[in-house]
């Protein structure tokens, strides 16, 4: 569930950024680079998990599972940077807390903007720019299911960002591997969701 404080912070911050033209303009090289980094990060996470499960190469490496979670998260982070870039938005040089800022930008521009959340209406969100785009691919699903996927994608980005900080050495190896699989699944689903949305805008 989106936290009220994040919704309010996102609305305040990005209305101000839009009014003051704070965003930098991304160039084609930036777009290509962020898209490649998103794909490569997820590929690296999958590669490391495969090595961890099927070879002895990393069995004594205590940081392998941590890096799988980190690279899974970065896949999502770069995917959102790419999505924002397609909309002419690149974080300005010197932006504070880039990871939190990118998360807030994602929920503002693709979930809050154009929905009831922007007008401060109570109750559940029923429309968003992303839900309308995703509906092109999911015609058989009703709007509430669409919104569950959209809100889930924002939650994935947030929880992965938190997991990157919270992952500790207390877990057993089996528990660590289980967590890495969850991270890869989240990153894969998130990437698919964003890529579908991007593709829908080209139709």
Residue ranges and their predicted role:
Residues 1-203:
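Terminal alpha-helical segments
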């Amino acid at each position: 569930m989106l936290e009220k404080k994040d919704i309010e912070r996102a609305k305040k911050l990005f209305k101000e950024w839009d009014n003051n033209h704070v965003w930098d303009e991304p160039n084609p090289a930036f777009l290509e680079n962020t898209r490649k980094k998103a794909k490569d990060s997820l590929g690296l996470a999958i590669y490391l998990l495969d090595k961890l499960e099927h070879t002895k190469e990393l069995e004594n490496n205590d940081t392998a599972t941590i890096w799988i979670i980190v690279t899974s998260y970065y896949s999502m982070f770069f995917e959102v940077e790419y999505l924002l870039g397609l909309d002419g938005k690149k974080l300005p040089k010197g932006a504070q807390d880039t990871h939190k800022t990118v998360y807030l930008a994602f929920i503002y521009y693709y979930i809050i903007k154009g929905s009831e959340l922007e007008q401060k209406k109570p109750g559940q969100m029923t429309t968003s720019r992303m839900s309308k785009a995703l509906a092109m691919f999911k015609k058989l699903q009703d709007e509430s299911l669409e919104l569950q996927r959209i809100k889930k994608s924002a939650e994935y980005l947030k929880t992965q960002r938190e997991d990157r900080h919270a992952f500790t050495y207390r877990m057993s190896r089996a528990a660590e591997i289980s967590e890495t699989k969850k991270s890869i699944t989240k990153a894969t689903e998130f990437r698919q969701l964003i890529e579908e949305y991007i593709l829908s805008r080209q139709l």
